[in-house]
Amino acid sequence: MTDDSRSRPQEPVPVEVAVVGAGQAGLSAAYFLGRAGFEPGPGFVVLDADAAPGGAWRHRWPSLRFGAAHRVHPLPGLPLGDVDETAPAARVVADYFAAYEARFHLPVRRPVRVTAVRPAAEDRLLVESAAGSWAARAVVSATGTWTRPFWPYYPGRERFAGRQLHTADYRGPEELAGRHVVVVGGGNSAVQLLAEISAVTTTTWVARREPQWREGPFDEQAGREAVARVERAVREGRPPASVVSVTGLAVTPAVAAARDRGALARLPMFDRIVPDGVAWDDGRFVPADVILWCTGFRAALDHLAPLHLREPGGGIRMVGTRVAREPRLHLIGYGPSASTIGANRAGRSAVREIKELLARPGVPAALPLTARRPPRVA
């Protein structure tokens, strides 16, 4: 008799709350779930696609120093402590996240890449992955944007003879030395990378519009106003603008130095790409060995496609952190909670609403599923 148990699909593991993603937003939600009395394992699980702690920060370019990164707010319950601001941001944040997971005994399973979330029996949501599946009473999706770099199309892009890369591919200025680099984009990454690259080689900056520069400090009131503007968009079902698009760009010493050497003399967007550069309809031409697309990212929400959440305008309508069309699902790290401080607040808010939802009469507390150990993760 042949034992074919290995080929049989595992039954879903019942869990109260499944958190998808272990970046700033996911860890914040996990912390507040523990504080709210959810037990690690049967109460909640965190499913992370990466092989180690750190979220998107693990993949930031090595030359990005912690002191030059967007302000990183500490996770709830554990200060960052004294940090060497000249250390690579990727290492500092990854070490901090690892310590955080250990300190609060968070049930993070990795690498687990969630491929789909879909309706299941008994008012559950089925969270699917190659490592197994979970039947959750509520889901917190905190998958961020790093895995979905946005590459805008311009005529001739496929015929460019040089190298094209995105912010997500950038590893440092040294590999670009001696080549003329056209940097495309008007956000924080574009300006940061221009400041680095223009110190070692020639550059041209191309962006649709001049960014809003911020010379002074960004206080708490300005932060609240910026978040409110992004929140208004998602409440109306529109795709969210990036938080930095409403906060403006800080003029750091490195940015000021780049400005002084002429690297921030912006050209409008080109009309097409030619094999040896970029061109405008008015006859202008700039040669290029490299085109660096600092054109941002989109929310990584493909795993939610089976739930049909999109509004006609392309966005997902939100009520706070809750998806209007699916009250068992919360999105954090999306829209107004895309910043580190926004993610912390969103984690607290999502857990509060989940606890209220699961306490309502008629919401089943258990499923007739065979209790099994969680799927093993290599």
Regions found by a protein language model. Give the residues of each.
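Glycine-rich loop at the start of a catalytic domain that most often binds anionic cofactors/ligands
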Residues: 61
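Glycine-rich flavin
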Residues: 64-85, 233-236
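Flavin (primarily FAD) cofactor-binding/catalytic cores of flavoenzymes
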Residues: 2-50, 55-56, 85-378
